[in-house]
């Protein structure tokens, strides 16, 4: 029965809040901008307020399933594993949502929720990395890649458990894989800068 939590986490993670918020505003974010359902594209198309709303909702898809699993599961050998797996499944749900033919977002906001549960201190450090990276480079993708990629290191330095470090590393890897087109555009100089309107 413990493994019902990861399944529920996937189904919750698959809820496309960016698309739903866009629809409520009369727009289909899959047809505009980067055509991504994530907070960055929603912000570009619909403004910062709705972009932030998307960021918050998508982050909760990673955070809340882990909170629920940690709260409802009794203490056992598998408790930390189920909690971490629930976070991973929330991210996979966002990236590959069953409701949208498995075509979803890049997982940064949902990953943020997972990382926040694993270590608020690590998130605080990586948010600083994100802000500095975006400010100096002009690219949100650079900030997302660096911030997520460094989370496992911060967890290691902060003395987190091996399972938490592995979980963070796997989520970061998923985020990097979903950003492969951004990485290619960064290498060819064709990535869109946040500073350019």
Swiss-Prot record:
Superkingdom of origin: Bacteria
SMART domains, A to Z: G3P_acyltransf
Locations listed in the record: Cell inner membrane
EC class name: transferase
EC number: 2.3.1.275
Membrane topology value: Multi-pass membrane protein
GO cellular component: plasma membrane
Species name: Desulfotalea psychrophila (strain LSv54 / DSM 12343)
Keywords, comma-separated and alphabetical: Cell inner membrane, Cell membrane, Lipid biosynthesis, Lipid metabolism, Membrane, Phospholipid biosynthesis, Phospholipid metabolism, Transferase, Transmembrane, Transmembrane helix
UniProt protein name: Glycerol-3-phosphate acyltransferase
InterPro entries: G3P_acylTferase_PlsY
GO biological process: phospholipid biosynthetic process
HAMAP family (alphabetical): PlsY (MF_01043)
Known role: Catalyzes the transfer of an acyl group from acyl-phosphate (acyl-PO(4)) to glycerol-3-phosphate (G3P) to form lysophosphatidic acid (LPA). This enzyme utilizes acyl-phosphate as fatty acyl donor, but not acyl-CoA or acyl-ACP.
A molecular function GO annotation: acyl-phosphate glycerol-3-phosphate acyltransferase activity
Family from the record: Belongs to the PlsY family.
Acetylation among keywords: no
Bridged cysteine pairs (disulfide): none
Subunit structure: Probably interacts with PlsX.
Pathway: Lipid metabolism; phospholipid metabolism
Source lineage: Bacteria, Pseudomonadati, Thermodesulfobacteriota, Desulfobulbia, Desulfobulbales
Catalytic activity: an acyl phosphate + sn-glycerol 3-phosphate = a 1-acyl-sn-glycero-3-phosphate + phosphate
